[in-house]
């Protein structure tokens, strides 16, 4: 059953750009990142913090890769399994890090690096599970740490940890990962944050009927802040690929 929240989210995206993602990425950006990471037939892909795996399911269907999605939320994984149908997707529940055992040619982390305060530990785990020559494909919110005032305004601020681009590149390099591609998405993600904010406000009464008034208010507040920060340059968004030496 499609919820009011999902309908509002889908309405915010340009035609053909919504594939079930819970983020500011458009489908075209997800495809471009997967291509840069050389995701293809038979490639073993680990998708961290996959949620309901909208991007992962699309990538699997279009590329023929072997896909493993990992998330901590059992209900999201149940939805992902149901929607995956006959696709060759597997899903595991885990709190990250550590990462699951095994070796992978590509590790994906879409729109959730922000939630990890210890980027060094995360990058080290990614390096551990990558095959030599493997690729880490991710998006990152680039900027200074939040001030106390910003943390007070942002809902769930304990999951909001921007990082400087130079600092992140250094952490990757120290772990044996070399950045091979980078593209800025600040403008398009500002547009998406603003469009989502507009749709959530328009349907706020119906959304509140499903998730509650407080959760709806926090959803709108968070998107207002992201729209402001991306629009002002307080935070910038990048898609990147780093390869294991």
Predicted regions mapped to residue ranges:
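Conserved class I S-adenosyl-L-methionine
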Residues: 1-37, 54-55
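Class I SAM-dependent methyltransferase SAM/SAH-binding core
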Residues: 44-48, 52-97
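A short acidic, Gly/Pro-enriched loop at the edge of an enzyme's catalytic core
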Residues: 97-107
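A short SAM/SAH-binding and catalytic strip from SAM-dependent methyltransferases
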Residues: 106-118
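A short glycine-rich, Lys/Arg-flanked "PGG" loop and its adjoining helix->strand segment in the class I
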Residues: 120-135
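Short, glycine-/aromatic-enriched active-site segment of Class I SAM-dependent methyltransferases
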Residues: 138-159
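Short alpha-helix
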Residues: 161-176
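Conserved Class I S-adenosyl-L-methionine
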Residues: 183-245
């Amino acid at each position: 059953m499609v919820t009011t929240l999902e309908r509002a989210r889908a309405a915010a995206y340009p035609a053909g750009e919504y594939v079930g993602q819970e983020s500011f990425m458009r489908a075209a950006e997800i495809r471009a990142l997967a291509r840069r990471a050389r995701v293809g037939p038979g490639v073993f892909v680990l998708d961290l913090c996959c949620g309901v795996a909208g991007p992962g399911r699309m990538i699997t269907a279009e590329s023929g890769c072997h896909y493993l999605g990992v998330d901590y939320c059992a209900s999201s994984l149940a939805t992902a399994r149901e929607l995956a149908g006959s696709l060759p997707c597997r899903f595991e529940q885990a709190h990250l890090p550590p990462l699951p055992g095994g070796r992978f040619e590509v590790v994906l982390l879409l729109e959730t690096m922000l939630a990890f305060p210890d980027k060094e530990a995360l990058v080290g785990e990614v390096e551990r599970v990558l095959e030599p020559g493997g690729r880490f494909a991710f998006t990152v919110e680039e900027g200074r740490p939040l001030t106390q005032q910003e943390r007070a305004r942002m809902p769930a601020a304990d999951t909001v940890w921007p990082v400087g681009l130079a600092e992140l590149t250094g952490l990757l390099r120290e772990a044996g990962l070399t950045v091979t591609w980078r593209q800025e998405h600040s403008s398009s993600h500002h547009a998406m944050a603003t469009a989502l904010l507009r749709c959530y406000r328009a349907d706020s009464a119906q959304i509140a009927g499903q998730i509650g008034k407080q959760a709806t208010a926090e959803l709108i507040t968070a998107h207002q802040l992201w729209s402001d920060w991306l629009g002002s340059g307080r935070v910038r968004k990048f898609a990147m690929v780093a390869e294991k030496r």
